[in-house]
């Protein structure tokens, strides 16, 4: 019989929020009796935007802004129905994007 697995990907701009959310998910899954692998830190996406500071000229004066997207991966192996119910009832911060694959 094939092992069932739930794969959870988390994305957030703040690494502290994503680590707290990952810790909550791991703790909830372990409490319900499932085996947990993770949280695994994935590469951070970094997008840089360059803007000219002046309105008309002075192209040499520029300002750079960056946006970092932190990602984590959690695998829950052999989840029980109790695990799925506990994960559905979990409240996580609004700054965390969650993608769940069964």
UniProtKB/Swiss-Prot annotation:
| A biological-process GO annotation | translation
Query: Could you tell me the superkingdom of the organism this chain comes from?
Result: Bacteria
Provide this UniProt record's keywords sorted from A to Z.
Ribonucleoprotein, Ribosomal protein
What family is reported? Answer: Belongs to the universal ribosomal protein uS10 family.
Recall the GO molecular function terms of this protein's record.
structural constituent of ribosome; tRNA binding
Q: What is this protein called?
A: Small ribosomal subunit protein uS10
Q: Which GO terms describe its cellular component?
A: ribonucleoprotein complex; ribosome
Q: Which SMART domains is this protein grouped with?
A: Ribosomal_S10
Fetch the InterPro entries from UniProt: Ribosomal_uS10, Ribosomal_uS10_CS, Ribosomal_uS10_dom, Ribosomal_uS10_dom_sf
According to the record, the signal peptide region is none
Native organism is Staphylococcus saprophyticus subsp. saprophyticus (strain ATCC 15305 / DSM 20229 / NCIMB 8711 / NCTC 7292 / S-41)
Known function:
Involved in the binding of tRNA to the ribosomes.
Question: Which residue ranges does UniProt annotate as crossing the membrane?
Answer: none
Could you confirm whether the keyword Ribosomal protein appears in this record?
A: yes
> Coding gene?
rpsJ
């Amino acid at each position: 019989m094939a092992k069932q697995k739930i794969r959870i990907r988390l994305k957030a701009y703040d690494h502290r929020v994503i680590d707290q959310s990952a810790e909550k998910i791991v703790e909830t899954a372990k409490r319900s009796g499932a085996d947990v692998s993770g949280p695994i830190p994935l590469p951070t996406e970094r997008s840089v935007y360059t803007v000219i500071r002046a309105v008309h000229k002075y192209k040499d004066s520029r300002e750079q802004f960056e946006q970092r997207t932190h990602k984590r991966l959690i695998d829950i192996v052999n989840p029980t129905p109790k695990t799925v119910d506990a994960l559905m009832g979990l409240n996580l911060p609004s700054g965390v994007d969650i993608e769940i694959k069964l």
